Amino acid sequence: MVAIIVHGGAGTIRKEERIPKIIEGVREAVLTGWRELKKGSALDAVEEAVKVLEDNPLFNAGTGSVLTLDGKVEMDAAIMRGKTLDAGAVAGIWGVKNPISVARKVMEKTDHVLLIGEGAVKFARLMGFPEYDPTTEERRKQWEELRKKLLETGEIRHWKKLSELIKEYPEVLRSTVGAVAFDGEEIVAGTSTGGVFLKMFGRVGDTPIIGAGTYANEVAGASCTGLGEVAIKLSLAKTATDFVRLGLDAQAASEAAIRLATKYFGPDTMGIIMVDSNGNVGFAKNTKHMSYAFMKEGMKEPEAGV
């Protein structure tokens, strides 16, 4: 049974009037992925679904990525094939429109798994990806407002103070996008993010770390969203697939993974989506919101929500 699920990030959507547009965004992404999935390729389905989310400035990935402490965009992305365990990822990349597509090229055109920073940018250019500025006016304005507050308080160098201030913008603090699909033969997972607003320059989250934010094998695939450091410490995406190997379906495994995150790091930290090799989808969160949408065989329209 074929299936696909996408997410647009876990956290709190502060401006609730945005919720209908966010739901429409994940719905559009899953429908795009579903069309590719019906052609037979989970890999294409995941890439195209994530690209739709990267191109939507409502989400913190690709266009609309949040800015670092020094006002730059540094994006992370990863994609993984469950049948072969092939994977590709980029971290701290800038100047490209769709990091998920660069990650796929890393997987298909190199012997490596992860390229970072300037090396990832150079590779993207070699692969024909043109220069692109993903910064939006809204993100720049938010960055300027927060930076002004930091300068006024004299706390610009203190990360704990930054953590307190960015709670004023929870809708971008933990926003990540991802997709997981099963085409009847293979499970593929992909994730993309702009990271944490006002993050330290050079900071890398869970998204491009295989096993932490993104993972797929022959039994299940997972894409995580939330506080990246939590997913890294728990190897959460891989752990979730291990739950499936032990006998849980995708939904039960998703819930078990979030219980684990909550046990060690408390509520309001993580969200996850999954698909297993029986075509079951799963999603869970310990945050107020996590936008999601899914389609599987027998459904005429996607289910979507926050």
UniProtKB/Swiss-Prot annotation:
One of its GO terms (cellular component) is cytoplasm. The record marks 175-176 as: Cleavage. The keyword Protease applies. It comes from the Archaea. Autocleaved. Generates the alpha and beta subunits. The N-terminal residue of the beta subunit is thought to be responsible for the nucleophile hydrolase activity. It catalyses: L-asparagine + H2O = L-aspartate + NH4(+). Substrate binds at residues 203-206, 225-228. Catalyzes the hydrolysis of L-asparagine into L-aspartate and ammonia. GO terms for biological process: proteolysis. It is an enzyme of class 3 (hydrolase). This is Plant-type L-asparaginase. Belongs to the Ntn-hydrolase family.
